[in-house]
Amino acid sequence: MDSWLEYDDIINQDIDIPSNDLSGSGTLCVGVHSSLLENSLNSIDSFISSKEEISWCGNQSTPIATKSHLSCINPQYVNPFDTSPVSVDTEFQDTYLLDAPSFAQPHFSERQSVDKTRSRCLSRNRRRKRHPNLHKNHQRLLGMSFPQDGFRRMPAESVNFSYFRDTGFNEPTIFPSSDTQNTRQLNLSKIATLIGYDCPLALVDVVTQKQIPNKMDMESWVKYMSLEPSKRGRIYDVLSLEVSTTKLAYYVRKPNIVRDLDLVNTVWPPGSFALGEYPHVDTYCLMSAENSYTEFHIEFGGSSAYYNILDGCKIFYLIPGTSKNWEAYTAWLTSSNDSDKKFLPNMVDVCYCVEVHSQQTILVPSGWIYAVVTPCDTISIAGNFLTFLHIYPQLSIYNLELQLGIEKEYQYPYFESIMWYTAIHFYLAFPDNSSRDGIDDIIAEYETGRLFDINAFTEQELDGFEELLNYLYIRAQILRDCDIIIDIYNEPVKISKNNGYNSAYTMVPPDLDEICVDFVQKFGAWITYHHRRSAKHPSCNCFSHLQTKLIDSGPKPANNSYQHQSNFIGVVISTNHNIIKKCQESQIQTGKNNCSFQLVKKRIKSTKKAPSWRSIIKAFKKRENTRCNFLSSLHATTFREDIVVRPKIKSFVLEQLIFQALFSFAINWTPSFFLNHSNFENIALSKETFNFGGEANCENTDTTLFTTWGDQGFRPSDSICYNDFNLLETANSDAEASIHELELQPLNAVNEREVDISQTDMTPSTALDTRVDTRVDSLPEFSNLILSPSSNDDSFQLDDLLSPSSSNLKQQIQKVVPQNSLEFSVGEKEKKAAEYSLLHTFSYKRLSMENEKPDTTKVPLKYNIQHEEMKAYRRKNDLEYIDQHFASSKSGISNGRNNNKEVNLTKAENVGIKKRRIMKNENNIYDFEDHSPVREKWGHRLRSRGAS
C-alpha cells in the first residue's frame, strides 16, 4: 500500500501516449514503471475484499479487467460519460485504474474513504484554528463539540415516496448517490467546458458572507482553484450557479425522490413547464474552495434541500426546524450582540454535526436551520424543492421572510402561485362528493401534472392543507381589497405594503382572481370531506374584534393616494351542513335583531361633491336549506318559487314580491328596486309615476334591462328597510363572487347616505329615491330572508323564507300579486311601456393595479330622462342593442371561445376576459327565445316561452 501511494502525484498527472500503444500488450503505461506496478498489485488486492466494496469505489475510478498481459490504457482517451458496464474477467482478480480526483486523495473503499477524509479533515481543522481568513463563526464551530446524530444512513432503493409519506420526512436523510448519472467522471475542467469558460459567476466572500456578482468568469475560477489553498488569498464560494439550462444538466439530475416530491414537477402547468417557464431553483452547481463556510440559514420559502457531493466533503451543522428554534433564529438574526452566548448553536437545545462525503446525498427537510463547512475543495450538485408534506413550515418560513423584510430576489420564486396551483391540483386530483358547477368547469381548464399515488391523506398532510386554506383565504381577501384582513381563526392579519394587492394580483393564476372566493370555499369543503371532521372555517362570528375598529376609525380622510376599500368584510367558507348549522346556533346569530350586515363599497377619491353610498346593508342570514338558481341569460329571467341570484352583478329577484305582470318584459330587478314601498302595494298605484334611475359617470359596459308597465316606471334605488334592518345589494360592485354573508355591525355605526341637492335633480320622483327612512311596515318578517349562493348543494323555497308566524304576510302577498302573471291589461299601458323599453344601468369597473388612479368619486347619480329624450334614444339604439343582447344570450349558442363545447346543465361562458357562471333551471317560467324579437309598431316586445 505504501509503495503504491507514493505515486499519487504521478497518477494525477496528464499522460501522453501514442495511439499505437493503446493496443499493446507489454506493460501498463500510466506513468509508473511496470515493475513497480506489479509489485504493488498484492497490496491493492488486500483493500478489495468483496464486490460490495468495489461498488463503493472512490470518485472517478474506472474498473478494468486484468489478464496475463496488462493492456496499456490512457484515461484521457476514455469517454468520461460512458456509463456502459465494463466486463470483468473472473479468472483474474479485479483491479482499479485510478484517475484520482482533482481536489481529494484517491480511495478504494467507502470505509477507507470516510476514515481517510475524516482524519485529513481533523488534521486540517487543527491548523485552521490559526487561519486568518476563516469566518469567525467557523472558528467557533471548530472549538465546539456536538452530539452524535441519529439520522439514518439508508440504501438508495429504500429512499422512496412511500417511506417519506410514512415518516413525514421530518429528519435529514443520507444515502448513496446511486441514481445520479455521469457524475463520477465530472471534474472542474469538464464542468467549465459544459457551461462555458466565459460564464460569469457570482461569488460569495466567505469572510463577509456577501455575494459579489460577476466577480469572475469560469476560466478565472478554474485558475483560482488550481492554486494551492495557502496561495489563494481570500476564500470564495460559488453557491448560485443554476445549471438546469446548460449542457451540464444532461449529465446531472435530481435524485428520484426529489423529482417525486417536488411540487413544481407536479402542480405547475405542464405547458409552461415544457417552455421553461417555471422556477429554476432545483439544480445548482456548487464549487467550494477549501475552508469555505456558509452561515446558519433556512432555505428560502421553507423549501427542502438536497446536496449530492460529486467530489470532496461537506460538514453540515443542523438545528431542527421547530417554532422555538425559529424564534431563536430570528432573535439571533436581528441581534447586534456578537458574543459566544448569542451564537445560535448556544441558543438552541441541540445542534447536530453530519459529514457527507463523495458520492453521497443528504436531504435536509423544510424549516431546518443549518450551516455548511467545506474542509477541502468540493464540487456538489444541490437544489431546492417544495413538498406537500411540509406546507405548514413552508408557509411559516415564507411569512417569516416577509416579516424580516427579505428582498424578492432572495425569496422562492413564484411561491404564491405554487400555493394556488397546489390547491387546484389536489382539489381536481382527489375530488370530494360535492356536486360540480360552473366554478368547477373554470378550474378544470387548468393543467396539472402527474398524480400522486395516494389512497388517503395523512394527518400531517391534512393539517398542511388547512394552513394552505388559511393562506389562500387571506390572499382572496386581499384580491377583494378588504380593509380588514382576518384569518380562518378570526384573528386580524397585518399585511405589509410589498405583499398587498399588486403582489396578490400578479401571483394569482390567470382568471382565478375572478372566482378566488368561490374556489376557496370549495377548497374548504374539500378539506372537510378528506379530513373526516370539520375544518376550521371562518364564520360570521368574527365581527367582535372588527366592530370597535370600524366604529373608532370612522370614515377615512381623503388624500391623493387611492384607498383600497372593502367589498365585503368577511367571507363565510361553509358548504358543509354541520358548519352552517353551527353558524346558525351561534350566540352572535341569536343577537342579529340588534345588528345589521354591512357592506362597504369601493370608493374613489373625488374632487366634486356627490352622493356617497358609504353603507350598503343587507339582512340575510344563512340557512341550511338554501338553494340558488342563477339566471339563464345575461340580463333577465323570472322564477316562480325561488330566489334568483345573479352573482356577476349581484342582482336578485324575489318571486311573489314583485308584480308578476312585469316579468313578461324580461326585467332584471336589482335589490335597490325595493326601496319604494309603493312597489309592494296594490297595482292600482300605477298612476303614480317614477322616473328611471341610473348611475352616471360609470365606465362599464355591463348593463341591465329595465322596462315599465303603463305609466309606472320602476327604477333601481338603494334599500328596503324594515325596523332596524336594511336590505341592500350592490348591482355595481366589482366583486365577482356571489352574495356573501357579511359581518354584523350595529346599525348606528352605519353612516347614512349623503345627498348633495346641487348634484341631484330633486323632482318629486327622485325625492322618493333619497328617502333613507322609508320603511316597509307590511313586511314584518322580511329580515328572515336568507341567501348563500356559495352553498351549491343547498335549497329552499319561498315558504322557508317566512316564519310560521308570518301568515299575515303571505295573505298580503296574495292580495298584492296576481296569481296569473299574464293577467294584465294590454293596451295603451303596454304601448307606453314599449317607449321606455331600454335603460342601461352600469357597474363599477374593476380598478387596475397601475399607478394611475382615478381622481373622481364615482357614485350612482339619480337623473331624469324625459319622455322625448328616451323616445329618441330608443329609436336610435333599440334594435341594435336588442339584437346584440339576444345574440349573447341564446341558450343554444355558446361564446366564441367555447363554440365547440356542449353543455347540458352547466356551461362556462367567456365574457371578455372574465368567465361568467350561468346555470339553467327547469323551473324558469319565462326565458328568451332563440331568435330576436319581432319589431312592432310601438317598439320591441320580448316574448316569453314556457309560461305556465
UniProtKB/Swiss-Prot annotation:
Name the UniProt record assigns to this protein: Putative JmjC domain-containing histone demethylation protein 1
| Record domain JmjC: where | 243-402
Q: Which residues form the signal peptide?
A: none
Cofactor mode of binding and number, as noted: Binds 1 Fe(2+) ion per subunit.
Family matches, as SUPFAM superfamilies: Clavaminate synthase-like
* Similarity remark: Belongs to the JHDM1 histone demethylase family.
- Alphabetically, which GO biological process terms does the record hold? chromatin remodeling; heterochromatin boundary formation; regulation of regulatory ncRNA-mediated heterochromatin formation; regulation of siRNA-independent facultative heterochromatin formation; regulation of transcription by RNA polymerase II
Query: What cofactor does this chain's UniProt record say it requires?
Result: Fe(2+)
The listed outcome for residue 307 to A is:
Loss of function
Binding-site residues, Fe cation: 297, 299
Instruction: Note whether Coiled coil occurs among the keywords.
Output: no
From which lineage does this chain's organism come?
A: Eukaryota, Fungi, Dikarya, Ascomycota, Taphrinomycotina
Q: What class of enzyme is it?
A: oxidoreductase
GO cellular component terms attached to this protein's record = heterochromatin; heterochromatin island; mating-type region heterochromatin; nucleus; pericentric heterochromatin; subtelomeric heterochromatin
Domain text: The JmjC domain mediates the demethylation activity.
Q: Which terms in the Gene Ontology molecular function aspect does this entry carry?
A: histone demethylase activity; histone H3K36me/H3K36me2 demethylase activity; histone H3K9 demethylase activity; metal ion binding; transcription coregulator activity
Q: Which UniProt keywords apply?
A: Chromatin regulator, Dioxygenase, Iron, Metal-binding, Nucleus, Oxidoreductase, Transcription, Transcription regulation
Write out the annotated subcellular location.
Answer: Nucleus
EC number(s) for this protein? 1.14.11.27
